[in-house]
């Protein structure tokens, strides 16, 4: 995933299935010119410590020059167990960690991929394309998270993804390759932060809903899973 700052700096995450020497990088002018971000320590061996990016994926920069990164903790090397997912944010100018949220143990094994950030209101919306697809809402003001799940808009459609003229294939539970069917993945906000847009990676439908309904749901449900029917009704 790639994101750019207002002054043209470019940052990218490196997919865990193609793990290299870094999980999060800043791309600089010139061929093959990049450096680990924010430093080498955060790009250390996956699973080697608390302050390490194990599987950096979705990245986004907000209006305050904070680089937000979702680390879903899967695709660990040497058959190691997945780690707890975390959401972190770094100041791109000082390279300092300015926010961190460690998801509960129950979130281990989920596949949080893309994210949309409302830095002004303090909410982050994350697409979880795992076996139980969901939109995860993180309230950074109160350090809480909630899930919106069990809705048809989150599911993959029976549509093939074509890459360079070929069907995208993923291994099934038996290791056999089959056409990918990935649920909710792309997710973004309108410029004013009022509307959330999302869809499945395998699909042709783009959905929208009031971001306010997600924010209010996160504050109205102090515990458990967010199952607000008004959110489902608001999806178009």
Where in this protein do the model-derived segments appear?
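Short loop/turn segments immediately following beta-strands, especially the blade-tip
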Residues: 140-145, 208-221
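A short loop-to-beta-strand structural motif that recurs across blades of beta-propeller domains
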Residues: 22-25, 85-88, 134-136, 205-207
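A short beta-strand motif characteristic of beta-propeller blades
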Residues: 34-49, 98-105, 146-147, 170-177, ...
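Beta-rich, blade/repeat-based domains predominating
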Residues: 1-7, 48-66, 105-124, 154-195, ...
